[in-house]
């Protein structure tokens, strides 16, 4: 049913189906079509993507994202720029911290069993792979989604909009950020169904 409501694409060429991870990353089960990569990127560059979901390595106070350079290690941006620049909406998804983070859930609440060693939300990213300033200039909606908090880019900065049930805003979010996010009142609670091992009942 959900597959009739959306069509998932991967930069390697699959159109539709269920994208695979791990060693099978780039493939898809039951894909409707397989395009060659240049054709897939023509689709991206032409603005064919409604919603782009990408990884979250580093974010800063201006909404910039870095996925391309970390100290002496240069990962490069790959197709990241093509996908993000012409998508109608962009969502960056990943864990709130990195390096050993362990989480569990109980009774619809998130529990941080072991905090990550590295903060991902820092004052200034080392290299700008995605520009928050440019996104605001062109009116592109941007969200940053983690297991414990959701942020939104607005004209005057990054806002904390949602917090997972069971999470303390000060000690488990703000204390692990290199900047203080803006808040438009009390952040909403993320839907507790996300943190329960049962059918969500999506409509």
Where are these predicted regions, by residue range?
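Conserved catalytic-core segments centered on acid/base and nucleophilic motifs
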Residues: 1-2, 52
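Short, small-residue-biased leader/transition segments that mark boundaries at the very start
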Residues: 3-8
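Short internal beta-strands
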Residues: 9-14, 93-94
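Conserved phosphate- and dinucleotide-binding cores of soluble alpha/beta proteins
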Residues: 19-201
